[in-house]
């Protein structure tokens, strides 16, 4: 049988997780397409960059067909650091498509 303190700890954890999810969803819903965003992506190896560029390229498929062209477009807005990549100028929809690789989202003013 669980002790009252354990039950309280579990409930507190669940509420914290729900609050974080609600805050994240609410924050992303407020951001309209085209707002300038900065994201940090973990694991800045060649495969990660190629995968993220492919995801972004899919968003821009009508305008930009080649992955190499997209890399050139992103290169001005991409900063590769030791443990993550920073890409600026993305919309909320593009960030959501990246899923689990996103570490941090910051709205640029």
UniProtKB/Swiss-Prot annotation:
The source's superkingdom equals Viruses
Query: Any stretches that span the bilayer, and where are they?
Result: 5-27
The protein's gene is named M
A Pfam match is Flu_B_M2
Q: What is this protein called?
A: Matrix protein 2
Q: Where is this site: Essential for channel activity, possibly by being protonated during channel activation, and by forming the channel gate and the selective filter?
A: 19
The cross-references to InterPro entries, in alphabetical order and at most eight, read:
Flu_B_M2
> Mind listing the GO molecular function terms for this protein?
channel activity
Q: Which GO terms describe its cellular component?
A: host cell plasma membrane; membrane; virion membrane
Q: Which residues lie on this side of the membrane: Intravirion?
A: 28-109
Function as written in the Swiss-Prot or TrEMBL entry: Forms presumably a highly low-pH gated proton-selective channel. Trp-23 may function as a minimalistic gate that opens and closes the pore. When the environmental pH is lower than a threshold, the BM2 channel would be activated and selectively transport protons across the membrane from the extracellular side to the cytoplasmic side. Crucial for the uncoating process.
Assembly and partners are described as: Homotetramer.
Record's bilayer topology term:
Single-pass type III membrane protein
Instruction: Summarize what the UniProt record says about post-translational modification.
Output: Phosphorylated by host.
Compartments annotated for it: namely:
Virion membrane; Host cell membrane
Q: What else is known?
A: Influenza B virus genome RNA segment 7 encodes the M1 (AC Q76ZA3) and BM2 proteins. Normal translation produces the M1 protein. The M1 termination codon overlaps the BM2 initiation codon in an overlapping stop-start pentanucleotide 5'-UAAUG-3'. Termination of M1 translation triggers reinitiation on the BM2 AUG in the +2 open reading frame.
> Where does it primarily localize?
virion
- Give the keywords, sorted: Coiled coil, Host cell membrane, Host membrane, Hydrogen ion transport, Ion channel, Ion transport, Membrane, Phosphoprotein, Signal-anchor, Transmembrane, Transmembrane helix, Transport, Viral ion channel, Virion
